[in-house]
């Protein structure tokens, strides 16, 4: 079985593949201070009886990746390991000014999106930041957009405005909030949906094509219900990319 690990700034998504089938997945908090020993205990607890025969990793957190490398050496002996970094074969041409700036997770999303849907495509990843990544008809990564993530925006409001606080991220009963909680929820959910819809429309106009828009990331399931432009929901898009890149390198 393939262990796929996507280390993000806030959360780490872990999946186990049996062939092309995602047999299980977990979302845990990313801790850049965690030691290799702590990670060994964590992953042994998650995996239980699963017999891992390969590991595929991407990370946007260098400190976390260093400990993860040591964990893999300790916990998994004599099995192939692929870490997505410069020099790794991905099959994705990176057509931006400085290809080294493209995060490994964005390249995995590009790879998976083109594999599943072809192109052109727009991947909207609702994570710590909201990323829109653009995939050409040939599967090239041609650029993207960064915007503050929903939780970052909510944290900023709660910390900077004395009368506001963090709320559950669900759609309120109406766009016009009847309470502080509903007003915040409306701004977060409908506001982000409107922002994404506006950006997707602008991207489609610039590409002059109706590119498929794919939502992924932890909060995608909330926003896609309120969006007018998001076409598909693939919650494990990055993990699928990790499976594909493993196959290309082993």
From Swiss-Prot:
One of its GO terms (biological process) is coenzyme A biosynthetic process. Keywords: ATP-binding, Coenzyme A biosynthesis, Cytoplasm, Kinase, Metal-binding, Nucleotide-binding, Potassium, Transferase. It comes from Frankia casuarinae (strain DSM 45818 / CECT 9043 / HFP020203 / CcI3). Its EC number is 2.7.1.33. Pfam families: Pan_kinase. K(+) binds at residue 125. This is Type III pantothenate kinase. A monovalent cation. Ammonium or potassium. Pathway: Cofactor biosynthesis; coenzyme A biosynthesis; CoA from (R)-pantothenate: step 1/5. InterPro entries: ATPase_NBD (IPR043129), Type_III_PanK (IPR004619). GO terms for cellular component: cytoplasm. ATP binds at residues 6-13, 128. Homodimer. The gene is coaX. The keyword ATP-binding applies. Substrate binds at residues 103-106, 180. Catalyzes the phosphorylation of pantothenate (Pan), the first step in CoA biosynthesis. GO terms for molecular function: ATP binding; metal ion binding; pantothenate kinase activity. It catalyses: (R)-pantothenate + ATP = (R)-4'-phosphopantothenate + ADP + H(+). Belongs to the type III pantothenate kinase family. It comes from the Bacteria. It is an enzyme of class 2 (transferase).
